[in-house]
Amino acid sequence: MRILSLPALALLLAIPASARQPEVTAADRAAHERMIVLDTHLDTPVYFEVPGWDFARRHLYAEDNSQIDLPRMDAGGLDGGFFVIYTAQGALAPEGYAQARDAALMRAVAIQRVVAANAARIGLATTPDEAERLVRSGRHFAFQSIENSWPLGEDLSLLATFHRLGVRMAGPVHSRDNQFADSATGQGRWHGLSPLGRRWVAEMNRLGMIIDGSHSSDETFDQLLALSRAPIILSHSGPRAIFNHRRNLDDARMRRLAAAGGLMMINSVFLVENDLSDERDALQERQKNWGNLDAAQRRRLTADLAALNARRPYTTADFDLYMRSMLHAIRVMGVDHVGLGADWDGGGGVIGMEDIAALPRISARLRREGFSEADIAKVMGGNLLRVMRQVQAAAGR
């Protein structure tokens, strides 16, 4: 380690902060703007049904806990990504399946309604070509994905229904085992995929939909990789070498994923042990309704959140740790197999990268690490578009 002499250190400290090189320079920002930047896991649709919440208005993370809106997409140079149809899992029974199906369909309708209401700034896309055309026209793009296939029940024809609605990616499972597969945080009911889950893989391949292995158990991941005729991705996962959690993947499996042409999109959750307490969940539900609170209610909520964070911070993970995770994945898998999937609006964000306005920090850091602009463009979005083309080209075979 190089140690500065006292005179040199004094000189450095005497330079005003404004005169030092900014973390994201004008050249960094220009390079960032030349790339198509996307994230594969945007949970923002949870806000689309909150009364008074406006996707077209800039919100503050400190107020309503949101991390994405159109102004912040502009600020962060986020061209688009996969807006998630998420359904919290309930009963594995006909009544539960029916309720979940209806909730998932309504979430898809909400995504399309919000996009249509902002058509001058964002459009729906189902292919890489459509996304690229939207970017060239000066607009953002919205792909759609399903997190947790529980709403399909035992009716795989619903995959085609969601495909017709524009959905182009789905994962079999979330935080609990379901009718398709074992979860990374489940009990191991099936030892991987169920018989129905194996048919789910075949139907996903037939339709040309990306298979998302995030939240899958190790056995489920192994079987997805073995059975799929097209590359699979992990839309929001990370290396187990950085944080030993079942939601992350070990290096050997990361190498196998890359060898099969797949991708790991780097998560900003599961870098450390986060506070996922019921108390925090309750406060975050109150935050989502920020726009409808009066001044006294807002002061009370802010005080309650500050008190909780003083006792038990949500995360101690910072931007440097996030980049360590990404750089580890690049070293293990290669630059052609890594991308962005930070779990925005679903628990993601780290200290120093609290919302998507901070995305230029990632491409700037990769420039500092010596990556070429072409390789950085792969990580920021190009890899996903390449794999999406491969998956869609393999449809129907």
Question: Which residues does each predicted region cover?
Answer:
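N-terminal hydrophobic targeting/anchoring segments and the immediately downstream early-domain regions
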Residues: 19-191, 244-397
